[in-house]
């Protein structure tokens, strides 16, 4: 099965808008990140499973509003007992699924219905503030949060303090 991005037929590359004469850091860069497996892990409410026993690609499940990552995989905390995993290891869900029994967890591959858009530049916070109610100025590297952006549900994953 071939992974096709949800933005495959609408995403165009190039420079748009007022970019003439501006420094590279002053430009807002918008890029879709392709070729990743995206899946969600949810622990059932009545489960007593010890989460400290779980490692995905060598990573622990992160605590509230945090993320954990290595070179291939990133795990975001989405809510109580709920995590979003994305990885360049396309068969990771198959490799790790044996840790999660069906009585305690639901694992859903959502790669076909989600996309990751990376924003980069000095003005990213200003763009997010225009349509998102979160105080993005307080975000630090490794923080994540769910919110809305002009009515669209988003998950913000703060990768770096560098623009």
Task: Please give the residue ranges for each predicted region.
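Basic, glycine/lysine-rich polyanion-binding surfaces/domains
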Residues: 1-163
């Amino acid at each position: 099965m071939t992974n096709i991005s949800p933005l495959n037929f609408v995403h165009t590359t190039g420079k748009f808008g007022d970019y003439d004469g501006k420094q590279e850091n002053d430009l807002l860069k918008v890029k879709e990140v392709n070729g990743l497996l995206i899946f969600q892990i949810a622990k059932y409410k009545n489960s007593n499973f010890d989460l400290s026993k779980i490692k995905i690609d060598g990573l622990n499940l992160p605590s509230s509003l945090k993320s954990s990552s290595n070179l291939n995989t990133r795990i975001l905390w989405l809510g109580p007992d709920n995590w979003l995993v994305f990885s360049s290891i396309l068969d990771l869900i198959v490799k790790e699924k044996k840790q999660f029994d069906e009585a305690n967890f639901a694992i859903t591959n959502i790669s076909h219905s989600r996309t990751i858009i990376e924003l980069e530049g000095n003005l990213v916070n200003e763009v997010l503030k225009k349509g998102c109610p979160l105080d993005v100025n307080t975000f630090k590297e490794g923080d994540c949060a769910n919110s809305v952006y002009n009515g669209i549900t988003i998950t913000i994953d703060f990768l770096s303090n560098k623009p």
